[in-house]
Amino acid sequence: MAVLPLFACGSPQTNLPKTAIISTTLCADGYLHSLPGIETRLAALSWQSRSGLSQTPQHLRALPQTDNDLERRLNWSSGIQVSSAGGGGDIDLKWGEDFQTVWDNLDLLASNLNVTDPAATLQARLGSLKPPTTSPLILYLDRSGATAGPGTFVDAVINAAGGTNIIKTAGWQSPDTETLIGLQPDIILSSFLDSNYVGVNDRTLRHAALEDKIRSIPQINLPGRYWTCAGPGLIDAAEHLNQAILAL
């Protein structure tokens, strides 16, 4: 598949066609990759497009990279710049932690870029998920021991996959270790535990009792790239989680 000519990282192509698309953030990368027939119009992706959190396919990782820096964005001004909420692009994505925001952003992009909206296809994928016989209680934990309740994209994915979030307090939170150990989930859902980064707040890796708790319960680890910016990767997350639940 042909793409726009490749140049060195951050080096803009002169005389870009007006239909060329420049992504200035990792969030925008993820959304653009979900649009059909868009690859030939991509001129640049975000500075994180080659990172472990990126869903950029290998054959597009050589594309130039850019970001929201005003001066660098001026270099790409002849194309259509897509950014995150408040990013100052020609198209700025909305922020939200639910599937409706994903559909809204896809509609925004499809209408402005004159491409087919993939929302119906993605919604059909969610609708085809097989519910488990019994909805398991699921506890989400990241490396720091933080978790997520109603109103978060993690909660949206758990529900879509047929699970029940054991955390009932809304929003993102960091319960004390004793509270976490006292919970009785059927499954622990984790992400980023296999990352090479090690931090001083990595309770799930550094607290022996919590680590023992995690090891005593079935654990499902989702790739961190699925969660990026609560974008279309949430559909992948829901599918992955649903399949893992059914396999237990």
Model-flagged regions — what are they?
Residues 15-20, 79, 85-146, 163-168, ...:
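Extracytoplasmic substrate-binding proteins
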Residues 25, 85, 143, 170, ...:
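Short secondary-structure boundary segments
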Residues 69-72, 175-179:
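Short acidic active-site motifs
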Residues 86-88, 189-205:
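A ligand-binding cleft/hinge motif common to bilobed small-molecule-binding domains
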Residues 20-88, 169:
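A short, structured surface patch at a secondary-structure boundary
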Residues 46-55, 59-60, 147-173:
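Alpha-helical, coiled-coil/dimerization segments enriched in small aliphatic residues
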Residues 10-12:
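Bacterial signal peptide processing site
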Residues 6-8:
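C-terminal motif of bacterial Sec signal peptides marking the signal peptidase cleavage site
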